[in-house]
Design a protein with these regions (language model features):
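Short acidic/polar alpha-helix capping motifs at helix-coil junctions
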Residues: 1-6, 19-22, 33-37, 53-57, ...
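Tandem CBS (Bateman) regulatory domains
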Residues: 1-12, 51-82, 86-95, 116-140
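Generic signature of intrinsically disordered, low-complexity segments enriched in small/polar residues
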Residues: 7, 17, 102-104, 108, ...
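Short, flexible active-site loop motifs that bind/organize anionic cofactors or intermediates
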Residues: 12-15, 45-46, 80, 109
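The conserved cystathionine-beta-synthase
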Residues: 15-33, 39-40, 80-98, 105, ...
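A glycine-centered beta-loop-beta connector
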Residues: 29-32, 37-53, 94, 102-117
């Protein structure tokens, strides 16, 4: 597991069941200031993902969310990543597919979620460290 993804698996991963109400999903997104929740089974296997954009898209189409449950609007064919994926691979997957969140899976179970913000922050840290090394080299 890369140190970057290892750090992400130590923070809370917010999930809902497929039968959770959309109101509950929205409350969880708002309460934890997150952009997506993963829909999981009782065995912690990924069944889907619901992002803020999924909710907005649904509202734009039908204008109704009362009475809906997670399985009604979740993205079912979820792209996931293994803990061994690199930051550059994450950036490529997320950019090419226009994803903002990817579940991290180990042994068939959800162990974390990586966001595009996490990837950008990691890449900035990497480039800042490289710039500092170059400054040290030049000043030596």
């Amino acid at each position: 597991m890369t140190p970057f993804l290892k750090s992400l698996t130590k923070r809370p991963c917010f999930t809902v069941s497929s039968t959770s109400s959309i109101s509950n999903v929205i409350e969880k997104l708002s309460q934890h200031n997150i952009g997506a929740v993963v829909v999981t089974s009782e065995e912690n296997a990924v069944e889907g993902i619901i992002s803020e954009r999924d909710i907005v898209r649904h509202l734009a189409k039908s204008k109704v969310i009362n009475g809906l449950i997670a399985s009604d609007i979740m993205t079912k064919d979820v792209v996931t990543v293994m803990p061994s994926v690199s930051s550059s691979e994450l950036m490529q997957i997320m950019t090419e597919n226009k994803f903002r969140h990817l579940p991290i899976i180990s042994n068939g179970e959800l162990v974390g979620v990586v966001s595009i913000g996490d990837v950008v922050k990691r890449m900035l840290e990497k480039y800042e460290a490289e710039a500092e090394q170059m400054r040290s080299f030049i000043n030596a």
